[in-house]
C-alpha cells in the first residue's frame, strides 16, 4: 500500500492517505490515471473486487456494448465498485477529477465509498436519483451521470449481477444462474462471506457447484 500511496501522491500532486486496504476502493475510478503504464495498448480496463464468482463475462460485455459505451456498470442505479469497465482514454481516465471532492476523498483516511454512491445504496435502490439525495461528497455516480447528461460520455447501467444471499444459485461450466432461469454476469459474495464458515476448501475448483443462503455445495456435499 505504501508503494501505491507514493505513486498516487506523485501522479496527483498531493499527499494521499491509504492507511488500510479498504480505502483503495475510493481510488478505483482513478486506476486508469494512476496505472496508465500498465494499460497501454488496451482499449478498455476494469475494476473488480476479490469476493466475486464470475460467470460468462463476454456473454454480457459484448463487442456491440463496448463499441457504444465508455463506462459500463453492472447495476442500474449506481456505479458498481465490485465490477465496472472503462474505455481507456483520457476522458474516462481523468473523469474522477470532475468531482468537487476528489482531493478531500483521496487525502483523508476516511472511506467515502467514492467509487459508488457515498453509501446511498438504499435510497438509490428505492428509485431515488442521486441528485435528490443529500450526500457528504460528490461520488463517482454523481460524476458519471453528470457527464452523461452533458453528453461528454456514454454510460451503460444495467442490473447484470447477483448479490445478497438468495440461495438457488448454480455455477455451471463458466456460467452462473439463479433458480435455473436467470443468468448473471457474476455473483458478489459480499453478504455470503459474512454468514458461512468453510469446512473443506477444495484444491481444484469444480466446474459445477451450488450456493445456498449459507453454504457452497458440490454433488450435494458441502465443499466450503
Predicted segments — roles?
Residues 3, 90-92:
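Short loop/turn segments at secondary-structure transitions that flank enzyme active sites
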Residues 28-71:
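GT-A fold catalytic core of metal-dependent nucleotide-sugar glycosyltransferases
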